[in-house]
Amino acid sequence: MATSALYACTKCNQRFPFEELSQGQQLCKECRIAHPIVKCTYCRSEFQQESKTNTICKKCAQNVKQFGTPKPCQYCNIIAAFIGTKCQRCTNSEKKYGPPQTCEQCKQQCAFDRKDEGRRKVDGKLLCWLCTLSYRRVLQKTKEQRKGLGSSHSNSSSLSEKEHQRHHHHHQHHRHGSSHHKISGNLSPEQDQGLWKQSIQKETPKKKPKLETKPSNGDSSSITQSMDSGGTDNFILISQLKEEVMSLKRMLQQRDQTILEKDRKLTELKADFQYQESNMRVKMNNMEKAHKEAMEQQQAKNRELLKQVAALSKGKKFDRSGSSLLLP
């Protein structure tokens, strides 16, 4: 019996079966727990966390050392504007695709029209970067759930075939046909389309799920399908709540930015008022000093004139008395 091939984990270099390694990063279960994929606090891009205290990616860490703490971008409100008022992603997109437009999901002025190139990936919608990532996550999760349901459905089909292999071929074909009819009745194309419309981006699937084409026992397929439908509904609800939280955070950031701007203007007005008030006080003090000096000068002149008048009056009296003595 041939042994299955083993593949090395990219982190610890230990060998595991291919099914136990993660897609893309090729990490084992222990490394996925020790180094999870998280979002950067600043640029919101996903990166592999080296330590629990590391919350920003390497690129943002270098930018923080070089430029300091970033500011919210004036377009997407992501705290990643290290240089100027726009983040690097919006700056590059604006140079390549022109000014931003309104996102059809979050209604923010931060979506760049990539023409047919980007709209094909999001079902023809004009979405910003964050809403595009959320849209792709919903699609990926739904595809994974449908793949898991299809594999479990095929396993149950093989078991039912082994149990009923002693029955007549016509009877077995009749049971599989009835089971296939039950599955198709449980999940009609209209219900499947309505389930997708509940997602954030209202995506409509172009292909029917695999469980419509594979026969199995009717009871087990209906139970598994109801569980999958409930799980999909819960995931869509969680995704909607997450998007609402993100939009509320953006609104809070905008309000905080508005409040900070108003506080800055109020501080400038107060400083200007204090400066003008101090200037007026200085002018008043100078005017008072000048007035006092002028009054003192006038009073000194008056005193001098009074002295001169008194001296002149005394001289006239002396002259009169002398002339009276000289007369016979």
Curated annotation (Swiss-Prot):
Plays a role in hematopoiesis and immune system development, and participates in the inflammatory response. Residues 165-183 have a biased composition (Basic residues). Keywords: Coiled coil, Phosphoprotein. Residues 185-201, 216-232 have a biased composition (Polar residues). Residues 143-232 are annotated as: Disordered. GO terms for cellular component: nuclear speck. It comes from the Eukaryota. Residues 237-316 form a coiled coil. This is Protein FAM76B. Belongs to the FAM76 family. The lineage of its organism: Eukaryota, Metazoa, Chordata, Craniata, Vertebrata. The keyword Endoplasmic reticulum does not apply. Residues 148-159 have a biased composition (Low complexity). It comes from Danio rerio (Zebrafish). The modification Phosphoserine is found at S188. Highly expressed in hematopoietic and immune systems including in the thymus, spleen, kidney, and blood vessel.
